[in-house]
Amino acid sequence: MAATRTAREVVELYNLVVWNQCNLALAEELFADNVIRHEVGEARTLTREQAVNRVREIWELFDKLRFDLNVVIADDDGEHVAIVYDSTMTTKDGTETKIASIEVFRVVDGSIIEVWNCGYQQGVWN
């Protein structure tokens, strides 16, 4: 039996492979049956299919999309991982936009079950 991925491995794969390479098969592996996405003022529960479709639908808007993880902090509890990222998104007409944010993930048994996102802003971290 294959070893379960660590929470840090899952979060890095999610950002660097699922998002950067639009690897939807891996996304299906990394999401739990249900994923709670927390934002300020609301939380939404997505099924695995909805979570994968979210990646697909965002990728359909862009020709290129890249996340760079500036900071990755894995908590000692083995479940929580915080990331600080910059992202460059290029539309099909060549327009490039840079955004930055911080997210916190909760990973249980190798699957993403919760994500906290405070929103993002245009620009990059200094």
Predicted regions and their residues:
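Short acidic-aromatic low-complexity motifs
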Residues: 2-34
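A solvent-exposed, acidic/Ser-Thr-rich amphipathic alpha-helical stretch
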Residues: 24-79
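Short beta-strand segments enriched in hydrophobic/aromatic residues
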Residues: 31, 87-89, 103, 119
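Residue-level signal for well-ordered, solvent-exposed loop/turn and beta-edge residues enriched
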Residues: 36, 95, 111-113
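Short, cysteine-centered beta-strand-loop-beta hairpins and adjacent loop/turn segments enriched
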Residues: 61, 88-96
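Short, surface-exposed coil-to-beta transition loops
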Residues: 66-68, 84, 97-103, 115
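Short beta-strand edge/turn micro-motifs at domain boundaries
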Residues: 101-126
